[in-house]
Amino acid sequence: MNSILDRNVRSSETTLIKPESEFDNWLSDENDGASHINVNKDSSSVLSASSSTWFEPLENIISSASSSSIGSPIEDQFISSNNEESALFPTDQFFSNPSSYSHSPEVSSSIKREEDDNALSLADFEPASLQLMPNMINTDNNDDSTPLKNEIELNDSFIKTNLDAKETKKRAPRKRLTPFQKQAHNKIEKRYRININTKIARLQQIIPWVASEQTAFEVGDSVKKQDEDGAETAATTPLPSAAATSTKLNKSMILEKAVDYILYLQNNERLYEMEVQRLKSEIDTLKQDQK
């Protein structure tokens, strides 16, 4: 029994303890298998990267390429160039992955800093005319329509002030005249009215069929004297009942009679011209008969 146990122990020790040459061979076989597996992984990763769609994020491509332990020099150069570009341009990851727009504090802070820098640069290059009018300067770079709105508001306010000034001028209370000024104003108006009335009364005296009639308005002293002289002559000569009971003439009636008289004179002038032409033709015929 003891001999059997000794044999089993020896056989197990022989199986566990291997020679050094066999151990080296086994280690080389393991390394070859691992390298073969890594090469297969690299080839599969390259194929998957080449077959990926155009919108695949750049992070996945870089991570798949960097996960391989053994690769070709071209792949290493490609990976290093991608790493350099990602270091120089960190916003590529931002644009490649739209879901990271709201979860990237670094990018948002950089954008805010750029906007602040742009605002400062625009403020430095503003002309003096805009600096004198702060209401027309746009503080928000995104809203381009506010300067136009401010300009329109300024124009509207200017127009409103002008209209208000005109209304106040029109609505200004009229100055009240003193009693002396009122009396002088009334005298001037009366004199102006009497001058017009006297001219119309003289026109009435020219018209033969209304010259002897009385007027219904006030006239000057010169016309009154002539009316008195005409009244004395009319008293000596009796007038018919129709003329005695006739109403006084107003200004419109006198002007109407004046127009009728002018037309009457024009017609008479044409008739006289025709008569003159007829007489001239008769004289010419008589001279020819005498010859």
From Swiss-Prot:
Coiled coil: none annotated. Residues 180-265 form the bHLH domain. It is found in: Nucleus. The keyword Nucleus applies. The modification Phosphothreonine is found at residue 237. The keyword DNA repair does not apply. Residues 89-109, 221-245 are annotated as: Disordered. Keywords: Activator, DNA-binding, Nucleus, Phosphoprotein, Transcription, Transcription regulation. Residues 96-109, 233-245 have a biased composition (Low complexity). GO terms for biological process: positive regulation of glycolytic process; positive regulation of transcription by RNA polymerase II; transcription elongation by RNA polymerase II. GO terms for cellular component: chromatin; nucleus. Transmembrane segments: none annotated. Its main location: nucleus. CDD domains: bHLHzip_SREBP_like. InterPro entries: bHLH_dom (IPR011598), HLH_DNA-bd_sf (IPR036638), Regulatory_TF_Diverse (IPR052099). The modification Phosphoserine is found at residue 104. Induction: Expression is induced in response to adenylic nucleotide reduction. DNA binds at residues 185, 189, 193. It comes from the Eukaryota. One of its GO terms (molecular function) is DNA-binding transcription factor activity. Present with 486 molecules/cell in log phase SD medium. PANTHER family: SERINE-RICH PROTEIN TYE7, TRANSCRIPTION FACTOR HMS1-RELATED. Homodimer. Efficient DNA binding requires dimerization with another bHLH protein. Transcriptional activator of glycolytic gene expression, such as enolase genes (ENO1 and ENO2), glyceraldehyde-3-phosphate dehydrogenase gene (TDH), phosphoglycerate kinase (PGK1), phosphoglycerate mutase (PGM1), pyruvate kinase (PYK1) and triosephosphate isomerase (TPI1) genes. Binds DNA on E-box motifs: 5'-CANNTG-3'. In response to adenylic nucleotide reduction, activates Ty1 mRNA transcription, possibly by controlling Ty1 antisense transcription. Acts as a cell cycle transcription factor. This is Transcription factor TYE7. It comes from Saccharomyces cerevisiae (strain ATCC 204508 / S288c) (Baker's yeast). The lineage of its organism: Eukaryota, Fungi, Dikarya, Ascomycota, Saccharomycotina.
